[in-house]
Each structure stands twice: as C-alpha cells, then as structure tokens.
Swiss-Prot record:
Residue numbers of N6-(pyridoxal phosphate)lysine PTMs: K274
One Gene Ontology cellular component: cytosol
Catalyzed reactions: N(6)-[(R)-lipoyl]-L-lysyl-[glycine-cleavage complex H protein] + glycine + H(+) = N(6)-[(R)-S(8)-aminomethyldihydrolipoyl]-L-lysyl-[glycine-cleavage complex H protein] + CO2
Function recorded in the entry: The glycine cleavage system catalyzes the degradation of glycine. The P protein binds the alpha-amino group of glycine through its pyridoxal phosphate cofactor; CO(2) is released and the remaining methylamine moiety is then transferred to the lipoamide cofactor of the H protein.
Matches recorded under Pfam families: GcvP2_C, GDC-P
InterPro entries assigned to the protein according to its UniProt record, in alphabetical order: GcvPB, GDC-P_C, GDC-P_N, GDC_P, PyrdxlP-dep_Trfase, PyrdxlP-dep_Trfase_major, PyrdxlP-dep_Trfase_small
NCBIfam families membership: PRK04366.1
Cofactor(s), names only, from the UniProt record: pyridoxal 5'-phosphate
GO biological process: glycine decarboxylation via glycine cleavage system
Protein name (record): Probable glycine dehydrogenase (decarboxylating) subunit 2
Species: Listeria monocytogenes serotype 4a (strain HCC23)
Amino acid sequence: MNLEETMPLVFERSIPGRIGFSLPESDVPETNAGDYFDQAYIRSVPADLPELSELEIMRHYTNLSNHNFGVDSGFYPLGSCTMKYNPKINEKVARFPGFANIHPNQPESSVQGALELLYDLQTSLVEITGMDEVTLQPAAGAHGEWTGLMLIRAFHEKNGDTKRTKVIIPDSAHGTNPASAAVAGFDVVTVKSNEKGLVDVADLKKVVGEDTAALMLTNPNTLGLFEKDIVEMAEIVHEAGGKLYYDGANLNAIMAKVRPGDMGFDVVHLNLHKTFTGPHGGGGPGSGPIGVKKELIPFLPTPVLTKKDEGYTFDYNYPDSIGRVKPYYGNFGINVRAYTYIRTMGPDGLKLVTEYAVLNANYMMRKLQEAYDLPFDQVCKHEFVLSGNRQKKLGVRTVDIAKRLLDHNFHPPTVYFPLIVGEAIMIEPTETESKETLDSFIDTMLKIAKEAEENPEIVQEAPHSTYVKRLDETRAARKPILRYQKEV
C-alpha cells in the first residue's frame, strides 16, 4: 500500500477557487508593498497555496495524524532517547495564561512569576547534578554539548592554555559528541572500550596529554553500563589539566541516586525534553540546559538569571561570557513542563523513576537474552544492547527485526548503535511502562526470533500492515525532496 495513493498531498487536493475562509473587506486604505520593500522581495506571481474548504483541511490533517506513532499511541523503546510518558499536568500548567500569554520583551517587573519559575528550575537542576550554576539557554542536547564545550574552550583560552585543542571521546559515544566537538573547533581523539564495554582506562592514559581540553563521557554509557572507574578517569583528566564533560542523555538511570558533580564532572548538559518529560520526538522544541562548576561560571552565556532583594533579574555583567547562544532565555514552555515534573515527583519520586527504569531494563534484558546475543552480560542501568548476529546467520538482519515490530504496533528500538556492537538492538523501556506492556514486547521479540528460524521471509519482507512498506532511506537522506513542486 502506498501512502501517496491512499492520501494525496494537500497541494494535490487543491481545487482552484475553493475557499476555506473569507476575510471581511478591508476598512483601512490599501498600501503598495513596493513602498516599503525592495522589488527583489516582492512576488511577481501569487504564492501557489492549496485551496480547500475548512472541512477538507480538517479531514486531511486528522487522517494524517492517525498515521503518527508516539508514546501516547504505544510502546516506544527507542534506546538512548528516554521515550517516557509525558504527564498531561505538564500541558495544563504550560497553558496557564500567566505563562502562555507573556512576552520575553516585557519588563522584568511584569514577569516575576515566570522568572521565579526559571530560577527555581535552575536551583533544582543544580541540586540534581551537583553543579554550582545552571543556564537554561541551550535549545536541545547537542546545542548544550556545543555550549559546554565552548565554555571549556573559553576557560582554557582565558588561562592562556591555547595548546589544548583535543577532546577525547569513547568509541561508544553518541554521534553528537564528536560533531559538537568539531563544531566547537576541537580535534577529536577516540578512546577505546575494553572487553566489558567500559572505557579502557589504560588507553585513556595513553591519549590524555597537555593538548587535552576535555573528556566527554556518558555515564552510564550507551551500552547502558555504569562507568565504574569514573573517579579514576576524572583524576587522570584533571591531573593533565583537562575538563570532564557529562553528556546527560542517560541521566534517567542515575537521577536522584548519584550526581555527576560528585563523580568529578566539570560541565553537564541535560535533556529536559527527555529525562524531565518535555514532549519530544516531533522535531522540537527541546531544552538542553548546562550546569558548570564554580571556575566556569564566568564564561556562562549571558544574560544570567539571578535573585536579588528586589526580585529576579537578568545579569549581563559577565565580561568573559561566551555570549548569547539563543535569542531570549531558552525554550520557556519546555522549561515550565520540566519544572512541573520535578515539583510533582519530588526527590523521592525522582529516585523511584531511576529504580523503575533500571528494573524494567534488566527484566527485559534477562528475558530476551535466550533468543538474542547479549554482548556484555552484566547488570545494566536504564537500557541494554542486544545483537542480532544470531539472526543474521539465518538471513534476518536487525533492520528486518525492527520492521517486523511495526506489524505488532511497537515502535522499533534504536538499531545499529552503538557502532561497537554488530547488528545492535538498543532497548530503553523507561520507568513509565507496565509489566504487561514489557511482557507483550518480550513475547513479540521472541516470536520474531522464532520466525527468523522457521519462516525468515515473513521477517525479511516486513512490515506487512503499515501505510508504507520500506522506504529508500539512503536516497531520502542523500536526495531529500523538502518542498512541493507543481508539475507543469
């Protein structure tokens, strides 16, 4: 079944002259756009916009929405993405008129309630991470990574230590880590993992040196394993004059149990749209605050939100600041949702989040290891990585398993990542799923493993029940069609 056959594009539905909404006649004099804009910016022909009735538009987009899959639709075990349920109380609070109807250009005196919320959120994140200060400016995780690395760069440059041009990153790291380091102007050095899936400390000692600016780590790492040698690694990097950067993508595994700051990390970024239930998966907006230790505070993006006797205010007096990294003060709506979540859960609730996330992951891992290879057989944290190598020998690849899950109304896990595991299947159940849901997914995965043995074609040709089958993902990435062009 082809989506283009079952549901034409809105442009293809257009009927010339069909009007969805009629505007009243203008009661002010008409003006000529040419009096205000250069001719180069004025259309010579009207925009080719679709013409449909309101009913047709409503049906079109309602039907499209039925093709979507999200956390509210079903189980979404996308590894390293923390696709947990987003409580709807978050949406209610974010829609309070006092939050939804304000503007960042208003005088500070008129938005003290909003500033208080942001300040309290910063304070909460300081406590959760063990940092000394937090900025809410970065818009998402990778943006937070880049911002944190720019702070580290500014710190070294301020100290005249310009030879520190290298950032060390594990071979199991998120792809955004080396990308962020490169964009921040650093050279990337890879440190190997050992046979247990952890950073090889001996190899780290070899690559650390006078040119080391920072070591970027995710803890637990992308295999879902806790880096037990983190204190020793922090000492190695600090003795060499470098900084330790924490990728907060996996904070859901340790939140309210241990703090990155207590492990020796100097900079932390968080994903409020993941760990703290700001909705994600649709392209944004997100929120990627960073926390820093005391010696990096002078380099924070301005303005810095502070509390004084007369109220909350933005402080621009940071001469060593790296400057703004986003217009205004971060994605306010996502920050409201994260604050609501933290206040709703409280310290004890956040601890339970971690405990249930880890419990669910270990339960699933043990149930699935009978049918799939488990490269690192040890207690995991919030997620775990299987390998489809056993199925590959039968002619069924990990991508086939992922596509077959669609027929059972499950979103596939992350596949082929981390790169150090062949035919990787990365599963993160999160804390919000019930045992019944986990068991249903486990049964389906075991069934697919059985199909790979007895009827591999049904897996190789999956999905069978979706609106579209297999897309040419390589072509879509290399030759994207990003806008509609009318056939002449």
